[in-house]
Design a protein with these regions (language model features):
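A generic structural signal for ordered alpha-helices
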Residues: 2-3, 56, 90
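Alpha-helix C-capping/helix-to-loop hinge sites
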Residues: 11-12, 85
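Short beta-edge/loop segments at beta->alpha junctions of small alpha/beta modules
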Residues: 1-10
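A short, charged helix-loop
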Residues: 53-63
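Hydrophobic alpha-helical interaction segments
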Residues: 62-138
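Short gly/ser-rich loop at a beta-strand->alpha-helix junction or flexible surface loop bordering the NTP-binding
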Residues: 13-54
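Sequence-level detector for tyrosine residue identity
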Residues: 8, 18-19, 23-26, 41, ...
Length: 138
C-alpha cells in the first residue's frame, strides 16, 4: 500500500489524490465489507478512469474533477463521498461517522461552496437529503 500511497495519494508533503467509492466507505466505517477494488482520484491520472494492478491490488484510478492539493483534498474527498452515497441507507450512526470526518478535516460550508460546482447536481441533492450539510460548520 505504501507504493500506492506514494504514487497516487501523497508523496512526502505533496498531496495529489484521495480514496473514493466503496473503499472510502470502508475506511470511514460506513461499510463493513472491504472492496476488492480501491478507487482513487489522483492528479497523476490523465484518463477519465482506468483499472490497473499494483502490488496485487486492483485500482480504479480517476482523473480528478479539479487539481488536488493539501488544501482541498479532504473537501473533494467528502464531496465525492456525498456524490456516491445512497442516502436511503444512511442511519444516525453513519451520519455520525460522516460528521466525524467533517470535524477531523475541518471542512467548512465555504469550502463546499467553492468546490461543489465541479460535481454533479446529485452531490448537492445528497448533501441536503442526507441532512449532512446541516452538520458542516460555516
Amino acid at each position: 500500500m505504501k507504493i500506492i500511497e506514494k504514487k497516487y495519494i501523497k508523496d512526502n508533503e505533496n498531496v495529489q489524490g484521495y480514496y473514493s467509492g466503496k473503499y472510502l466507505l470502508y475506511q470511514l466505517g460506513i461499510s463493513k465489507v472491504k472492496p476488492k477494488t480501491i478507487e482513487i482520484y489522483s492528479n497523476n491520472e490523465t484518463q477519465r478512469s482506468k483499472v490497473v494492478n499494483i502490488c496485487g491490488k486492483r485500482l480504479l484510478l480517476h482523473k480528478p474533477r479539479t487539481k488536488i492539493d493539501k488544501f482541498n483534498a479532504s473537501v473533494l474527498c467528502f464531496l465525492e463521498l456525498m456524490n456516491g452515497i445512497d442516502t436511503e441507507t444512511l442511519d444516525e450512526y453513519k451520519r455520525k461517522l460522516i460528521s466525524d470526518y467533517i470535524a477531523e478535516n475541518r471542512i467548512t460550508q465555504r469550502q463546499i461552496t467553492k468546490y461543489i460546482p465541479f460535481f454533479p447536481d446529485k452531490t448537492c441533492r445528497n448533501l441536503i437529503e442526507s441532512e449532512v450539510i446541516y452538520r458542516v460548520p460555516q
